[in-house]
Amino acid sequence: MHAVRRAIISALLLACAGLSGAAQARPQDTALRVVVPMLHPSAREHASYFPRLLQLALDKTMATDGPYEIVHYDRELTSPRQALEIKHGGVIDVMWDGTNRQREAELLPIRISLLQELNDYRVLLIRRSDAARFANIRNLEQLRMLKAGAGVNWPSTDVLRANGLPVVTSIGYEYLFPMLRVGRFDYMPRGVHEAWSELQQHANDGFDIEPNIFLHYRVPYYFFVSRTRPELAARIERGLKLAQKDGSFDALFNAIPAFQRGMAEIAAKKRRVFELKVP
């Protein structure tokens, strides 16, 4: 009888110890795990801005929503593949990219522009040998005589084509630069925050940035999550708004040299602005 009583007491003590351990482990066990796209080692200087901004948003909501963990997926995914994975509950939970109708129909956007107005202004990456050719372009009709290069699934590709600008596409971003070099197309519209770092990376390819033209069209850059994860979207949105309110969003944005360069280029107002309609 005493042996049975001792066994019962021992079992109760073990159960209590187990509950205590579970309580101590609970914050880690229930932490929100957010898988984001891999950042390629050769990614441009501003690429880390997006996961850092996501981290900032989740930090701002820890008091109300609990702990979290951001994990980078271990393989590189194209933007269309990222969207497909999120849509079907695959290997990543959040992506960041320019928006379009299809993406917003399939995924859930957090409608706070991550790049402010930077993604709305495009400069033209051209062959240096074509500088005089572009110097004579005064309007959109003249630009339509030349061919642009862009990614096959980029939101910008739809905008260019909708405005009558011929576009040669590539399935991979990295293939566009050799295509420009050998004359497959005449220019690459690049975000005003992207072009100068790309020019530096391809310093030996004979490229230049056309100095007189802006293409202007509004393609906000958003975080996207699955339509089955509205609670994640709501948390990110609340966190971003809190960061906007206390100034930490702008502080992170303004700490990126490429963003500073882009905003200065917009503010200078030295370029002709060709307005494009977004379909």
Give the ranges of each region predicted by the language model.
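Extracytoplasmic small-molecule ligand-binding "clamshell" domains
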Residues: P27-E106, I236
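Short loop->beta-strand "edge-of-pocket" segments that line small-molecule binding or catalytic clefts
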Residues: T30-A47, N136-N153, D186-Y187
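Periplasmic-binding protein-like
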Residues: M38-H40, L118-V123, D130, Q200-E237, ...
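Ligand-binding cleft/hinge of the Venus flytrap
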Residues: L54-E69, N136-Q142, V152-G172, L199-N204
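Short helices/loops that flank or line small-molecule/ion binding pockets
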Residues: H72-I92, A162, E174-H193, H202
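A ligand-binding cleft/hinge motif common to bilobed small-molecule-binding domains
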Residues: I86-K87, V94-E106, Y187-F214
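A conserved helix-loop-strand patch within extracytoplasmic ligand-binding domains
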Residues: L114-D158
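Ligand-binding clefts/hinges and TM-proximal coupling segments of bilobed small-molecule sensing domains
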Residues: G151-A162, L240-P279
